[in-house]
Amino acid sequence: MDSEAVYAMAPGADQVMVVGTGCDEDQALLDAASAVLTGDGHRPLASIASNSWQIPLGDVSPQTVHAIDVRAAAEGIGMYVASGDTPGLTVTDSDPYAVAVGGTTLGIGAAKNRVFETGWSDDFGSLAGGKWTDLGVSGGGGGVSDVYRQPSYQKGVVPASMAQVRVANKTVLGRTVPDIAADADPDTGMLIGYTDTDSHGNPGPYRTVSSAGTSLATPLVAGLVADAQQGQKSPYGFINPRLYRLARTGAFHDALPTSTSAPQQDRAAYIAPDDTSTSEDVDVLDAQGRPDTQQVTAKGYDTMTGIGTPNGAAFIAALRRAH
C-alpha cells in the first residue's frame, strides 16, 4: 500500500524499501529508520521517509525516537509518521521533529469533486437479530504530548485551548498532534492491487481491495512533498516550520465537522451489507463527542487533521515558494 500510494502521488519517484529484522518488532522498526539515515556511509538512502507504523507510548523511550528524528533533521531528511488508527498519541508521532500525519474521511462526487472532507473518526455498529452492538471508534490518532512542550512552529496556529496539558500539577502547552492529514478512512480509501498465490505457489487472479488508515495518509503526503521537492536545489528535510507558516492559506484545505462540511444526505452513515451473515454493519462518520476520544475536527487547526489536507497543485507551488 505504501509503495502504490507514493507512486500514485509521485509516479517518477525513486523508492527504496527498508525493513528491519529480529524478534523485537519495535527495535526492528527503529533499526530500519536508522538504516535510512546511515545509507551507504556517505549519504542517506532517501530525503523523505514515509513511516506507516507506530510505537505505543511506553514501549520505547521518547529519547530513543527523538535521537533518530533530530539526526534526520540535521541530515536533511523528512520523517513522515502515521498518527495511528485509534484515538490518542504514540511515541513516534508526538516527537516535535516528526511530521505527524492524521486522517480524513473524503467524499468524492460523480464529477470527481470534493463533496466533503472531515476528520476520520468513524463509529462502528452492527445490527443482528434485532440487537445493536457498538463496535467502537476507528479514526486517526492525535492529542497533546505531556513529554514535549509546544514547539515554536505551532505557536500562533494551534489554539491554546487545544494545546493545554497537565504536567507536574501545572498546566502547560504541549506538542500537539497531528501536523497535517490526508484520506485515511477505509470507507473512502484507495484501491490497492495485488496478485495472490494458491497453496502450491501458483499466481492467482489480479485483485483490488480498498485499503486505508493513516498508513495510507502518510505515503500520500510524502508523495506530494516529493513532487514539490522535485527539481529543487536541496531537499526540504524537516518541513514543519514551513508547513505551519502556510497554515490558513490556499495551500491547505480545512477539513471541517460533517455538520458544516457535508451535504445533509451525506452526513449520516455508510452502510455495508455483510455477505457472509445476516448482520449489517453501520459506520457513522465523524463520531465526535464519544467518551473514548477527546479529539475534535474544527475550523482551523484541530487534533484530527492538524492544519488541514494538502491542496494539490496549490500546496506544491506554495511549498516551493517557501523553500
Language-model segments: what does each one mean?
Residues M1-G103, D134, G139, S145-A212, ...:
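Substrate-binding/charge-relay-adjacent region of secreted/lumenal peptidase catalytic domains
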Residues A222-Q230:
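Short glycine/serine- and small hydrophobic-enriched flexible loop segments
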Residues Y97, G102-T171, T176, D254-T276, ...:
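Glycine-rich (often Gly-Gly/Gly-Pro-rich) flexible segments and glycine-rich loop motifs
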